Amino acid sequence: MDTSEEAIVRFCRRYVADLLEIEVDAVDPEADFDHLGIDSAIAVALLTEVEEHYDVDVAPETLFDNPTLRAVAVYLREQLARRVAP
């Protein structure tokens, strides 16, 4: 599985676009969640999907500390790298 930052961003963008019923290109990974129309229910759904897809635990406050898809991807990449580091 590709766990690069860009792969995580692509995964999150596709998931959010599907939930919001918009084109993937309309999901700016640099935009704040509220600007994208991501409410708490969608944020929780995204969090759950990310946890299942990448087999990682993510605390809910992570989304508040990282309020863009890019920031979430950076955070996840760091968490995944720590998990596989010797």
Please place each PLM-identified region on the residue numbering.
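Hydrophobic micro-packing sites on short alpha-helices
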Residues: V16, E49-E51, V72
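Amphipathic alpha-helical interaction segments
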Residues: F11, A45, P67, A71-V74
